[in-house]
A protein has these predicted regions:
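Short cytoplasmic-facing helical segments at TM-TM junctions of multi-pass membrane proteins
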Residues: 159-160, 202-249, 272, 276
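Transmembrane-helix boundary motif in ABC transporter permease subunits
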Residues: 60-66, 135-165
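C-terminal transmembrane helix and the adjacent membrane-cytosol boundary/short C-terminal tail
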Residues: 56, 212, 243, 247, ...
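Periplasmic/extracellular loop-to-transmembrane helix junction in inner-membrane transport proteins
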Residues: 28-42, 92-139
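Glycine-rich helix-loop "coupling/hinge" segments at transmembrane-helix boundaries
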Residues: 182, 210, 258-295, 314, ...
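Transmembrane alpha-helical segments of polytopic membrane transport and secretion proteins
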Residues: 1-24, 32-37, 46-81, 307-323
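Generic hydrophobic transmembrane alpha-helix motif, especially the helices
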Residues: 165-202, 209
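Transmembrane alpha-helices
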Residues: 193-197, 230-263, 290, 306
Length: 323
């Protein structure tokens, strides 16, 4: 028996046992008195479907333990086991025993029920956050690209702009929110400005560094062949600086998300951060957790998309770290 087959059988058995035990606890173990409860049918259906999917995946993987399906499952099985243990402990410590005091801690089925109840408002808040982030992030990234390109290519522009970048850039975007509210005409535009500022500094810094690091031999060869300034910038400097620019986009997305969370607390009346703060004000902690979960999924999806774009644009680069 191959080592991978043994690994799949061991971890697969543990995963099935944990998730099976979790399903049994949800359906068979009585709830403690005083705990907040909700219908368990949706949760049981999700876990049951997951168990069927896991069994099917295991059968396919064990049939061809050296194949792609088996490698993918072997890579994910420890996390599947960890998830089963986590949910089992979560269920036992909340609604089944009351070890963790309500209303601060509730069982997963309560979160599912709150998600279903609030899905319309959450969808509206998600779209609002996405639009605000897109507006600010695009504006800030474009401004950072132009600023960094000017500083990297022109010494005169670098003389004037680099001190400004060094002075203003490190200031946290959230610290400028009171000033933005005073100067910018509307609160929504002030929130977009804060998000844009969060993206501008990393993009400008990395673009400048990338353009400055273009090998001089590339430029000399292009000039020898008759290339003008526009060609040198568009066909030599920018492609060569692309890895650094994408790093700036990645870093800028993180700072923009942080700025977005702050801006939504005072600048808009819809958004994921607004929703989380609103339900927290009513001491509705389960809905607060639901908002946090949606926010986490939203942020992860954006990071995955950006890294997919990076991997596609830099497919030629050796030893590229994949997401």
């Amino acid at each position: 028996m191959s080592a991978r087959r043994r690994l799949l059988r061991l971890w697969g058995a543990i995963a099935l046992a944990l998730w099976g035990a979790y399903l049994a606890v949800v359906l068979l173990l009585p709830d403690t008195a005083g705990a907040r409860t909700a219908p368990t049918a949706p949760l049981a259906a999700i876990v049951g479907a997951g168990l069927v999917g896991l069994v099917s995946w295991l059968v396919l993987a064990l049939d061809r333990p050296t194949g792609t399906v088996a490698r993918a499952l072997a890579h994910r099985l420890p996390w599947i086991v960890f998830g089963g243990g986590w949910f089992l402990a979560w269920q036992l410590s909340t609604v089944k025993s009351g070890l963790l005091d309500p209303p601060y801690f509730v069982a997963p089925e309560v979160l599912i029920a709150d998600l279903v109840d609030d899905w319309t408002l959450l969808a509206t808040c998600l779209m609002s956050s996405g639009l605000l982030l897109l507006t600010g992030y695009v504006i800030g990234s474009v401004a950072g690209f132009i600023t960094g390109l000017l500083m990297g290519w022109s010494r005169r522009a670098d003389y004037w702009l680099h001190p400004l970048l060094q002075t203003v850039g490190p200031v946290p975007a959230s610290a400028l929110l009171p000033l933005a509210v005073l100067v910018v005409p509307t609160t929504y535009l002030s929130a977009a400005f804060i998000v844009a500022f969060g993206a501008w500094f990393p993009m400008a810094t990395m673009t400048r560094a990338g353009v400055r690091s273009v090998p001089k031999s590339f430029i000399d060869v292009a000039r020898t062949l008759g290339a003008g300034e526009g060609f040198l910038v568009a066909r030599v400097a920018i492609p060569s600086a692309l890895p650094d620019m994408l790093t700036g986009l990645f870093t800028g997305l993180g700072t923009s998300l942080a700025a977005l969370m702050t801006a939504e607390l005072v600048g808009v009346d819809r958004g994921l951060a607004w929703y989380i703060n609103w339900v927290k004000g009513w001491a509705d902690y389960p809905r607060m957790y639901v908002g946090l979960v949606v926010l986490i999924v939203f942020c992860r999806a954006l990071m995955v998309l950006l890294f997919k774009l990076r991997s596609s644009l830099l497919a030629w680069q050796q030893n590229l770290v994949r997401w």
